[in-house]
Amino acid sequence: MEVLDATSLAERLKWEAKGYWLHFEAETPLEKYPAKQHARRVQEKLGIEEGLIYLSGQQARNNEDSDMPAPFRQLRYFYYLSGGPTLAEALVKYDVDEVYYSDEVSDYIIDWYHHSCNRGKLYTLHDPAKSPIGNHHAPIDSVSLQPAMNVARMIKDEHEIKLIRKANDISSKAHREVLSNILKFTNEAQVEGLFLDVCVSHQAKQQAYDPIAASGPNAGTLHYDANDEDFGKRQLMCLDAGCEYELYASDITRTFPLSSKWPSKEAANIYRLVERMQELCIKRLAPGVRYLDLHILAHQIAIDGLLALGILHNGTKEEIYKAGTSRAFFPHGLGHHIGLEVHDVGQAELMSVRRGKQVLEQSSHLEEGMIVTVEPGIYFSVYALQHFYLPSPVHSKYINLEVLNRYLPVGGVRIEDDILITAKSYENLTTAPKGDEMLEIIQRGRSNVNSIPARRQSGRTQITEDEPPLLRAPGISASTPQSILRPIARSSTMPAELKQDKSVDFEPFEGPSLFSNFRRSMTTDEKIQRWQQDHIPTTATRINLTPSSQYKSVCGSNTREVKHVYMISGSFPPGTARGALREQILPACKQCTILCETLDRLRQSLSMSKESPEAELDVSPVISQKQIRNRRSVSSTARHDLRGDRERPQHSPMTGLANGLSAMCLEPLNHVSESPTPSQRRAGGCTPHWRGQNRADQSGDDALRAAQETQILQSKPSVRSNPATDQLSAKAVSDVLLELQRQGPAAGSDRCTLGKQEGVEGIPAISRAKNFHVSTGGSMVGEARRAEE
């Protein structure tokens, strides 16, 4: 245990004052990266007593033509002996004595050279001319350092073994999750995505290499990395993927069926053969074993199995091995070192027959502390077979084409584990399931490992106490409250228009809409259809309407070629349903329109009378036109009133009727307006609504007992002057007034609406509802009788 004295503590506080935060929780050498131990090992391999090693780290840089940083990957040789992003962190986290900035290295080298009395060399990895150390007249060796470091890196210390074991644990959990979900997937990209998801959630953001998710024939390509094809009817998936934890790698491969059981006898046979190759080779692992011998053993087992399956024939095991035909199905080596690199360094290839220099250890024999992979495989590469082995008479005579064609759909099978060589045997660091355990996980559909949080099925789901603690991403402090770490639930409300959208990724909210007046805007097609209804006249009709005395038009005609304004009683015909009307495109009746315009002018004249009470309107000529043939008095009176020279009495008995009829005639199609203003109520006016009140009069003579709501269909006609208006007979106007009088009394403050009579298809109607103020001084009956007289 390191003891902090006053001097060292003061030095650390000095670093803190400069803005560096020192991690006092990592004080013991066992918790630090063993950089000193690695340096002593390199010194031992170099066989020197004194010297200086110069290594430069990776320089951070941006992407070309961009201000965004490029992915940073520290140089492994540099990291092996030092590492660390800042001076303070390097001093505390890594087992070193002194730390300097790069621009201070040159001065340090000069001081070292003068104090060493030329007794040591300066060791570099590369040509010193390419390094920034300059010329210090010191002897520089750029040849010996890399081989020595390669040999040193082959043997892992306890700290490195711990990191590699951690990387294997995370990768094994990811493989388990893939197995438990493989029956849900249909594409290679989904497999890769889930694997990366699990690794990142366990603080292993970087992968040791690009994952290989090869299905079917793609498994015959050793370094396939497209990972984007559908499974279809393919049989197997070969997943070669391993994460990196604190720069130390893992390398794991599993091959599994894309169904709950082996899809074919051929697939099961090849898997059992590869499984036997790996098991027998792993059992032979021990210190002092030459790894090349295990590679040869794997080939012999493969040849025996291929002969038994009938893929190879016409030769003995020795003949086929000497011819090299087995490499058509097992083309790579049995394994490699693993450490800071997925294919970690060594003095020579792991399966090389040559030995190293006398000063260096032999590289092809296993030693305690090595971590190697054992990854046999059998592949059916159509490209390699067609272009190299089948055209060659040396190999083609041993290959049975008839049997080979049955095995081509298998693609390839590889099984790979990371093995630590111990003092007497080995330890398998990989815990990813294989064999029967693998099939059981696929069949169950779950892995029994809480590697990733279960997906929240609803934003309202309460988190129970039995849920495992959430995993923290890199950089999140352990003291962060759990409430902050919990995933944010998606919004629990949505527009009412979208409630019917059923999606697994969007949870509908069954409550009220946030927008009280929300209405969906019309689409382009709807706008075009609406414009055509308003502007394009047509004589086509799809409604079979039988004229009836119950539905009488304003003009007195019930022709079907035009759209009339009807006067109907307040009740719906029996047996009709609301909302059953169909939109029709018909030209408006000119006579109905002219009558409505005339009534509108009358309303305007009556409303102007309120502004000038002293001027009274004489309405008797209008009503007495039935007996007097002078039409000119009506038109002149209307024109005179519109100019505003005269006004009606404020309480004219015609006020409410004129206002009501004009409002009914002039409201636009499908318009929805608010309630009448106070001024409108005082004037006896009305505004159309989607809904009306169904009031029943207490009197038995009231024909408006069942007045119902209506919808507006009549388009807004023009209110400009029409010459034909002057030629209207007073008889037609009088008939309209008398018809309204016969439909019911004029008492009360009522409302009327113009629109399509609900339950009667295609009938725009003037509904004489009981919310229409007609008179204050007398009844319509009295006025009509005086007009008749």
From Swiss-Prot:
Pfam families: Peptidase_M24. Residues 638-650 have a biased composition (Basic and acidic residues). Mn(2+) 1 binds at residues 251, 375, 416. GO terms for molecular function: aminopeptidase activity; metal ion binding; metallopeptidase activity; peptidase activity. It is an enzyme of class 3 (hydrolase). Residues 607-658, 670-704 are annotated as: Disordered. Residues 622-637 have a biased composition (Polar residues). Keywords: Aminopeptidase, Hydrolase, Manganese, Metal-binding, Metalloprotease, Protease. The keyword Protease applies. GO terms for biological process: proteolysis. The keyword ATP-binding does not apply. Binds 2 manganese ions per subunit. Mn(2+) 2 binds at residues 240, 251, 416. Disulfide bonds: none annotated. It catalyses: Release of any N-terminal amino acid, including proline, that is linked to proline, even from a dipeptide or tripeptide. Its cofactor is Mn(2+). InterPro entries: Creatin/AminoP/Spt16_N, Creatinase/aminopeptidase-like, Pept_M24, Peptidase_M24B_aminopep-P_CS, X-Pro_dipept-like. Its EC number is 3.4.11.9. Catalyzes the removal of a penultimate prolyl residue from the N-termini of peptides. Belongs to the peptidase M24B family. This is Probable Xaa-Pro aminopeptidase SNOG_02267.
